[in-house]
């Protein structure tokens, strides 16, 4: 019976090791995932920018709780938590400055997603109205 326990222990160790490797592969960032030039970011699609933003956030200690659906997202693309704070994030990869509408949308998304904070992340600038 002792031999069977050793074999079972080794089998459990191997399965746990394989699971950890898989989990690291899925969750861990590779430097190339977030190592982009501004020109490369400007060429991304909106969805690519959302995924890139999520990768950068994850690499900086944020927990990605949800990537919202492409339409009907109530004004948030990513829901994250950081140090016990839940945050709604609106990603805007624009060629022009981001207007006040994006800010209003993500603020309204805070309530829908039960968040304490809201952020708009962009590759551009904000209009004066959006900054106020």
Language-model features, listed with the residues they occupy:
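Mixed-charge (Asp/Glu-Lys/Arg
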Residues: 1-132
């Amino acid at each position: 019976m002792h031999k069977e326990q050793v074999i079972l222990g080794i089998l459990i160790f191997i399965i746990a090791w394989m699971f950890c490797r898989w989990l690291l592969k899925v969750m861990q960032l590779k430097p190339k995932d977030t190592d982009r030039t501004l020109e490369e970011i400007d060429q991304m699609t909106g969805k690519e920018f959302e995924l890139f933003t999520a990768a950068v956030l994850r690499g900086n200690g944020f927990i990605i709780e949800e990537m919202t659906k492409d339409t009907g997202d109530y004004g948030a693309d990513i829901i994250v938590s950081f140090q016990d704070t839940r945050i709604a994030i609106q990603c805007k990869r624009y060629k022009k400055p981001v207007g006040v509408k994006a800010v209003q949308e993500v603020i309204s998304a805070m309530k829908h997603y039960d968040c304490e904070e809201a952020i708009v992340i962009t590759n551009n600038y904000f209009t004066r109205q959006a900054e106020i």
